[in-house]
């Protein structure tokens, strides 16, 4: 008999139904469950797939550069970044006739194009790229790196080049490589690029391979470094009248602590960023050398963790046993990595708009909105993934004997306290926040808006004041003009920071009021509820009072039959599934808040947000409905405009989202009956019955149907909001 898909599971390959195909796809990447897997092959497969992932990333970034160089308008954008709209790529085959061709021909292009809202133009401009040739060179280089990555992945699957399990489990060497080799060296290299290429470019000087060795990045070269006069590198920074990309008003400093923003570009000073990356490089180069590798000096991770036993005895045996638990569990490591990456991605979203690093990106409002939303959604998915793999760790990898009375075991032992506290916090936030919103709605409806309950966020305002915001009149720390911190800030460190905090032309410490207070607590509700579901899923993954033997059923199971009532929907997978809905809900509130606050800020009518955000009808009417009007009018009986593609995507997103409910509400029995009826009809229809199938058609499992429903819900939700966001912002600001 010929080998059938899936080759990695003989049991599935011999399944006579279509379950073979769907379960095969579902478990293709679950290497641990494959027939002939060994620990060594598991690690090697994952290692090789990392190179494949890198190849895809480099190919994708190469494609961005290539298409902008080929079909974009980078060189004309560079001449006037604030008024030329950056082109992402051409539209090959514009449908819907001449009106569409005219609507999408913009940015000085000869034909229909898509506008770039990704910020790549600003990024490339900031780091010193100026011509299409520069972009082509970058694209080719990244294509080369992509090919190298593919070759490396293939090479590490060959017998001679396969790393051993001991190599993968050498934690200290891995820390050395990742901290010093990847973070440290790459940060140092990036500092080098900023100092040698980007900063000269910002001052009108082009540094390329042909003059790279001739141009001194600083008039005194390496002299100050070797003589210990490092402060010379900070002297004579760019002036406040500096025109970015020219020598007008330019200085000679390369490593500064100015603080605040370049007045023209509204982005952080390049010399501050070079200084930052140099500091990061220094820290990580040291951090990577703290652990014992080949030379018998430095810390051993195992010794460190085993020594972490708090003397009071309140945490039992502390971190004893954790080294082997983490080092032998890929799911634990992946959970930690995803949790870290999720937090970092959300921080990227927050900092890209509040402390913009790229020249002129702060004035490209649609790009700001798109990047914030993009990074917050990605953070949400990554964070839910972290808890999913944490739960899989508890089911597949956790060994109670190895972890007796350590912090991990003790957390499992008092999980009831953790879960009930999260539940209490969620209930408190939910009832109080909704109560305030609904009270305010009723007051508005009865024509007595003055009876709203409006709470000033005084603690948050106090924190903003402590960081230098003076408008609240708190007179504390950095907002206290007589304090030592304020005076030091004026001269010694970050003199531009206090100006930036108190200017109204950026998004640093926006003025907040009762509307912000309410939506902050709505978001807190979403975060706590999502966390409750995810934490409960992981802590109950091995078993609960209701189902003590849960771990024997694996990560995802629908129920344990009709004999054990109430065992449906309690697998760790079900917790992940429910949490994703709450995560999307939360990110929705986060992005609605950010977008509405900023739209009113950019339009100069902040009072609209302040007055309408204190009750639910305000959000529905003055944010969602008001801003979707242009979108819904993207095409009409009289023709179409450049928002039509977003109008179509808005409709299509709703369709995909609604399709999700078909799978989420009607379950397996319905589909099984439908399939059997369709199969009966097929077999009795002339011509159609000439086509036969080897696998008996059966409905998806309950868990799979839920996944299909969840995927449609998520994709539709994001498509709908992406179209709304981009159309409503670009429709107002271009």
From Swiss-Prot:
UniProt binding sites for phylloquinone: 671
Annotated transmembrane regions: 46-69, 135-158, 175-199, 273-291, 330-353, 369-395, 417-439, 517-535, 575-596, 643-665, 707-727
Entry keywords, A to Z: 4Fe-4S, Chlorophyll, Chloroplast, Chromophore, Electron transport, Iron, Iron-sulfur, Magnesium, Membrane, Metal-binding, Oxidoreductase, Photosynthesis, Photosystem I, Plastid, Thylakoid, Transmembrane, Transmembrane helix, Transport
Gene3D superfamilies, per the entry: Photosystem I PsaA/PsaB (1.20.1130.10)
Membrane topology: Multi-pass membrane protein
Single GO BP term: photosynthesis
Top-level taxonomic group: Eukaryota
Pfam families named among the record's database cross-references: PsaA_PsaB
Similarity comment: family membership: Belongs to the PsaA/PsaB family.
NCBIfam families: psaB
Subunit structure: The PsaA/B heterodimer binds the P700 chlorophyll special pair and subsequent electron acceptors. PSI consists of a core antenna complex that captures photons, and an electron transfer chain that converts photonic excitation into a charge separation. The eukaryotic PSI reaction center is composed of at least 11 subunits.
Annotated protein name in UniProt: Photosystem I P700 chlorophyll a apoprotein A2
Organism: Helianthus annuus (Common sunflower)
Upper taxonomic lineage: Eukaryota, Viridiplantae, Streptophyta, Embryophyta, Tracheophyta
């Amino acid at each position: 008999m010929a080998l059938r898909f899936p080759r990695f599971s003989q049991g599935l390959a011999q399944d006579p139904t279509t379950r073979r195909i769907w379960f095969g796809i579902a478990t293709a990447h679950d290497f641990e469950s494959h027939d002939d897997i060994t620990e060594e092959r598991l690690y090697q497969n994952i290692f090789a797939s990392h190179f494949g992932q890198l190849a895809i990333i480099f190919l994708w970034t190469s494609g961005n550069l290539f298409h902008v160089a080929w079909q974009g308008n980078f060189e004309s954008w560079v001449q006037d970044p604030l008024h030329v709209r950056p082109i992402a790529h051409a539209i090959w085959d514009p449908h819907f006739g001449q009106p569409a061709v005219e609507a999408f021909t913009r940015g000085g292009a000869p034909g229909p194009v898509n506008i770039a809202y990704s910020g790549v133009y600003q990024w490339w401009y900031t780091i010193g790229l100026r011509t299409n040739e520069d972009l082509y060179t970058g694209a080719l280089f990244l294509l080369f790196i992509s090919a190298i990555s593919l070759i490396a992945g293939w090479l590490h699957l060959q017998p001679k080049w396969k790393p051993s399990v001991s190599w993968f489990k050498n934690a200290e060497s891995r820390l050395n490589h990742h901290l010093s080799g990847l973070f440290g060296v790459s940060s140092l290299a990036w500092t080098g690029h900023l100092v040698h290429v980007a900063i000269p470019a910002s001052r009108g000087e082009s540094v390329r391979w042909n003059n790279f060795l001739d141009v001194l990045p600083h008039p005194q070269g390496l002299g100050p470094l070797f003589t210990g006069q490092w402060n010379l590198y900070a002297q004579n920074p760019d002036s406040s009248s500096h025109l970015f990309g020219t020598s007008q008003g330019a200085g000679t400093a390369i490593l500064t602590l100015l603080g605040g923003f370049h007045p023209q570009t509204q982005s952080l000073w390049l010399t501050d960023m070079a200084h930052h990356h140099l500091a990061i490089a220094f820290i990580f180069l040291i951090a990577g050398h703290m652990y014992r590798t080949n030379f018998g000096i430095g810390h051993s991770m195992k010794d460190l963790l085993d020594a972490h036993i708090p003397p009071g005895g309140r945490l039992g045996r502390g971190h004893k046993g954790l080294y082997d638990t983490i080092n032998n569990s890929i799911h634990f490591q992946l959970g930690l990595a995803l949790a870290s990456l999720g937090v970092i991605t959300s921080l990227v979203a927050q900092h890209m708009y509040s402390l913009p690093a790229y020249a002129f990106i702060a004035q490209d409002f649609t790009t700001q909105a798109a990047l914030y939303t993009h990074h917050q959604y990605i953070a949400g998915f990554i964070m839910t993934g972290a808890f999913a793999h944490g739960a899989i760790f508890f089911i597949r990898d956790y060994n109670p004997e190895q972890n007796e009375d350590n912090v991990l075991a003790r957390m499992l032992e008092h999980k009831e306290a953790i879960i009930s506290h999260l539940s209490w916090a969620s209930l408190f936030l939910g009832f109080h926040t909704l109560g305030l919103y609904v009270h305010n709605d009723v007051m508005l409806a009865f024509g007595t808006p003055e009876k709203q309950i409006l709470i000033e966020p005084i603690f948050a305002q106090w924190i903003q004041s402590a960081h230098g915001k003076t408008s609240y009149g708190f007179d504390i720390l950095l907002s206290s003009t007589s304090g030592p911190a304020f005076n030091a800030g004026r001269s010694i460190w970050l003199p531009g920071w206090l100006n930036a905090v108190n200017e109204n032309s950026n998004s640093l410490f926006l003025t907040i009021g009762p509307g912000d207070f309410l939506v902050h607590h709505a978001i807190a509700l979403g975060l706590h509820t999502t966390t409750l579901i995810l934490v409960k899923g992981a802590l109950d993954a091995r078993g609960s009072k209701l189902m003590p033997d849960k771990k024997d059923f694996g990560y995802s199971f629908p129920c344990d039959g009709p004999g054990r009532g109430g065992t449906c929907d309690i697998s760790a997978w079900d917790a992940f599934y429910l949490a994703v809905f709450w995560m999307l809900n939360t990110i929705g509130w986060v992005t609605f808040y950010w977008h509405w606050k900023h739209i009113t800020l950019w339009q100069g009518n902040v009072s609209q947000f302040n007055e309408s955000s204190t009750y639910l009808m305000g959000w529905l009417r003055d944010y969602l409905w008001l801003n979707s009007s242009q979108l819904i009018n993207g095409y009409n009986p009289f023709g179409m405009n450049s928002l039509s593609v977003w109008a179509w995507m808005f409709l299509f997103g709703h369709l995909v989202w609604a399709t999700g409910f078909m799978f989420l509400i009607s379950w397996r029995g319905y589909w099984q009956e439908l399939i059997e009826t369709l199969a009966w009809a097929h077999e009795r229809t002339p011509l159609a019955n000439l086509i036969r199938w080897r696998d008996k058609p059966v409905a998806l499992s309950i868990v799979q149907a839920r996944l299909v429903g969840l995927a449609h819900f998520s994709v539709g939700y994001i498509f709908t909001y992406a179209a709304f966001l981009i159309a409503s912002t670009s429709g107002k600001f271009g």
